[in-house]
Structure formats: structure tokens, C-alpha cells
Amino acid sequence: MAGMKEIRGKIKSVQNTRKITKAMEMVAASKMRRAQERMRAARPYADKVRAIAAHMSRANPEYRHPFMVANDGATTAGIILVTTDKGLCGGLNTNVLRATVQKFKELEEKGQKVEATAIGSKGLGFLNRFGAKVMSQVVHLGDTPHLDKLIGAVKTQLDLYSEGKLSAVYIAYTRFVNTMKQEAVIEQLLPLSSEHFEADDGTPATSWDYIYEPDAQAVVDELLVRYVEALVYQAVAENMASEQSARMVAMKAASDNAKTVISELQLVYNKSRQAAITKELSEIVGGAAAV
């Protein structure tokens, strides 16, 4: 009977765990929909800023913003690592961290030092354990990221690049493909290449005739900074949508596994109960025969 009592306790424990994972699955599904809406809402802004910056850059070819100039003499590269603040999201962080380590090795083989900016607690903890130099960080963004919280940490890298101290700036994050698929990617933020200013069909954007106030250089300077900030925000929004999708899938898998474990334990319990009843009946029959 002690064995049956222990099995009942295990069944109850797994049932309670399944209730938790099921609730977390439902919460993640709700947050995923909101995160996807924010991700989609951010894209038109970045696209429009890119288009305007492209038009103005072509209209003023004599001016080259520092973001568009390669710092060939710099021996340090910057990486902005975007991860989650929380766990329980499958291999989401593992994949982007693995890709980041590979990028570190590639840059170091080229004689480049690497300085990082961490967005998310998981990435910050990893970089500290990895021994990387962390120049800035931002954690605990919550479910609704605001650009104001990101600007300070990101601006550190942008300023260093403008001063010619960084050879390039990369951003590592998890791109949202669909609910079941997310991809760890590393993209070059700076220097801005001509690909950044191409239309969606791959053709160069056409030039417009602008009247500038106060002047073209000041407007281009502001636009390019806003554009890079928009790219970072888009990466964070994509990462958050990926996080909630991965968490929903992970919690669903956990709930399904818990259901399987409960069924197996229930079968063991029934067999034990059947064996106990059979034993009792045998004892009763044996006792009656003895009388």
C-alpha cells in the first residue's frame, strides 16, 4: 500500500505541474499575439525612415555620414547581443549565444578585439561568464520594450563607431519566422552599406528634391541615427515575439509530456492496485480453505 500511496503522490505532483505549464502556455500565447503586433507595427516606421534617408543620401552624394564610412584602421568590433530576461523558452537563447560565440571567434581570428552590449539578462550573464568585455547593458525590458530604454546602451556603440574606434557593429538576435520557427541571426549594423538603402525589390531608391531646414547635413545626421535605432528596436521586437512563441511551444510540449507521464503512472497505479486486490482475495480464499 505504501507503494500505491507514493504513486498517487507522484500523479498529484505531475498533475499540478501540468496545470502550471498549461497556464504558462496560455499566457505565452496571449503575449505572443501582442508581441507580433508590435513587431509588425515597427516595420513600416523603419522602412519609411530608410526610404527617406536613401533619397536624401542620393540627393547629397558629397556628404558621407560617419555611419556610412568604413573604419578600416580600427582594431575593435562591437556586438549588440539581444536575448531574453527569462528562461523556459526552449533553445532560443542557446542558439543565438552559440552564433555569437562563433562570431567572436571569427573576429578574433582576424585580429579584432570584441566589445559587447547586452540586451537581456540571459545574454549579460553569458557574456560575463564567457569573459567578454561588456561596455553597456540593459535588462528587464518587460513585455513592452521602449526605445527610450534601449537608446542609452546602444548609443555607446554608435558613438564609438562615429569616433572611428570600432571597425563594425553587429547585432545578434532571434528572428521571428513563424510560430513554430525562429532563427538566430547576426547582422551588420554599421557601416551602413548600399543594401540598406535599396527598395524592397532590390532596386536603388529614386531621388526626391527636398527643401532642407536647417540644412541637409543636419537632417541626414538625425535620420541615420533614427534609422539605426529603428533597426535595433525591430531586432528587439522580433526577439520578443520569438521568445513568446518558443515559450508557448515549450510549455505545450511540457504539458503534453506531463499528460503522458500521468497516463503511465496511472497504469502503474492500476496494476499495483490490481495486484494488491488479487493478493487480498488470495489470502481470503486461502484462509477460508484452511477453516
Swiss-Prot record:
UniProt function note: Produces ATP from ADP in the presence of a proton gradient across the membrane. The gamma chain is believed to be important in regulating ATPase activity and the flow of protons through the CF(0) complex.
GO CC annotation, single: plasma membrane
Keywords: ATP synthesis, Cell inner membrane, Cell membrane, CF(1), Hydrogen ion transport, Ion transport, Membrane, Transport
The organism of origin for this protein: Burkholderia ambifaria (strain MC40-6)
Keyword Cell membrane: yes
PROSITE patterns in alphabetical order: ATPASE_GAMMA
Organism placement in taxonomy: Bacteria, Pseudomonadati, Pseudomonadota, Betaproteobacteria, Burkholderiales
Database matches in HAMAP family: ATP_synth_gamma_bact
Designated name of the protein: ATP synthase gamma chain
Pfam families reported in the protein's UniProt record: ATP-synt
Listed InterPro entries: ATP_synth_F1_ATPase_gsu, ATP_synth_F1_gsu, ATP_synth_F1_gsu_CS
PANTHER family: ATP SYNTHASE GAMMA CHAIN (PTHR11693), ATP SYNTHASE SUBUNIT GAMMA, MITOCHONDRIAL (PTHR11693:SF22)
Summary of subunit composition and partner proteins: F-type ATPases have 2 components, CF(1) - the catalytic core - and CF(0) - the membrane proton channel. CF(1) has five subunits: alpha(3), beta(3), gamma(1), delta(1), epsilon(1). CF(0) has three main subunits: a, b and c.
Record-level GO BP terms: proton motive force-driven plasma membrane ATP synthesis
